[in-house]
């Protein structure tokens, strides 16, 4: 479960051997969610509106890196770290 970014208490991961469509996982204060690459929560229980907004903002800024990591994951290659929100 490689961590690809951490910001404001939000941990972002991508798991190997995942299924389409492309997505990533976020955890915030013990709550978890699965997000599409646009940063929209597909399933999960993250209730903080602020955390959800920050994940969307981060995903929008780093869409290309998320796509690159998804392709690397499918090939079994190492995932790159992605800059956190500042």
Features from the language model and the residues they span:
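Basic nucleic-acid-binding interfaces
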Residues: 1-86
């Amino acid at each position: 479960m490689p961590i690809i970014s951490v910001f404001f208490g939000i941990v972002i991961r991508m798991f190997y051997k995942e299924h389409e469509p492309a997505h990533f996982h976020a955890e915030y204060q013990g709550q978890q969610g699965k997000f599409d690459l646009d940063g929209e929560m597909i399933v999960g229980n993250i209730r903080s509106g602020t955390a959800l907004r920050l994940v969307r903002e981060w995903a929008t800024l780093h869409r290309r890196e998320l796509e690159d990591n998804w392709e690397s994951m499918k090939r079994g290659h190492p995932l790159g770290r992605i800059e956190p929100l500042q």
